[in-house]
């Protein structure tokens, strides 16, 4: 077994010097408050969005179920993304907002903790799982929905400090 390197020559941290996948050793990092916010959208037909808003779908309250699914997704991130550390999240908030002007549901997730590694993947996973849940609950009436624009919006904490998407 080879010793893990801090990063490969091209800056990748999840590979050792021999190119093997490794979980990054964060034991030497300082614990700091870390927050990440991610966002995304589910685009759909106007009638589908109307049915969501009016709670007229057979599977129930789409926004509430998707909100819970997003929270659960954030908590299960290390089970889904192979090299993510299990984290003691102190906050997971998922908001789903209907946007009738653009026939979509806008999803925002905020994750926080005090720890040695960031929560970006947890926030992104929360958005993706919430979006997939919207799709699952509405696919009987609209198979053409699209999950779009899933991305990190901001992060704070750690040695890289604050970052905000432009």
From Swiss-Prot:
Residues where substrate binds: 83-85, 121-122
EC number, UniProt record: 4.6.1.17
Catalytic activity: (8S)-3',8-cyclo-7,8-dihydroguanosine 5'-triphosphate = cyclic pyranopterin phosphate + diphosphate
Family annotation (InterPro entries): MoaC, MoaC_bact/euk, MoaC_sf, MoCo_biosynth_MoaA/MoaC, Mopterin_CF_biosynth-C_dom
Gene3D superfamilies: Molybdopterin cofactor biosynthesis C (MoaC) domain
Pathway(s) per entry: Cofactor biosynthesis; molybdopterin biosynthesis
Pfam families on file: MoaC
GO molecular function (one): cyclic pyranopterin monophosphate synthase activity
Keywords for the protein's UniProt record, in alphabetical order: Lyase, Molybdenum cofactor biosynthesis
Active-site positions on this chain: 136
Single Gene Ontology BP annotation: Mo-molybdopterin cofactor biosynthetic process
Function according to Swiss-Prot or TrEMBL: Catalyzes the conversion of (8S)-3',8-cyclo-7,8-dihydroguanosine 5'-triphosphate to cyclic pyranopterin monophosphate (cPMP).
Subunit description: Homohexamer; trimer of dimers.
Record family assignment: Belongs to the MoaC family.
Protein name per its UniProtKB record: Cyclic pyranopterin monophosphate synthase
Organism the protein comes from: Rhodospirillum rubrum (strain ATCC 11170 / ATH 1.1.1 / DSM 467 / LMG 4362 / NCIMB 8255 / S1)
């Amino acid at each position: 077994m080879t010793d893990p390197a801090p990063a490969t020559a091209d800056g990748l941290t999840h590979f050792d010097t021999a190119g093997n996948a490794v979980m990054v050793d964060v034991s030497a990092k300082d614990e700091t408050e870390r927050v990440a916010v991610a966002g995304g959208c589910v685009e759909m037909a106007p009638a589908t969005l109307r049915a969501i808003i009016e709670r007229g779908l057979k599977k129930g309250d789409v926004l509430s179920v998707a909100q819970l699914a997003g929270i659960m997704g954030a908590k299960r991130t290390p089970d889904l993304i192979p090299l993510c550390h299990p984290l003691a999240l102190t906050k997971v908030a998922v908001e789903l907002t209907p946007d009738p002007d653009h026939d979509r549901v806008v999803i925002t997730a905020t994750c926080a903790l005090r720890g040695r590694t960031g929560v970006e993947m947890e926030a992104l996973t929360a958005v993706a799982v919430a979006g997939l849940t919207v799709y699952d609950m509405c696919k009987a009436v609209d198979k053409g929905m699209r999950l779009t624009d899933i991305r990190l919006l901001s992060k704070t904490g750690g040695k890289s400090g604050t970052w905000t998407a432009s």
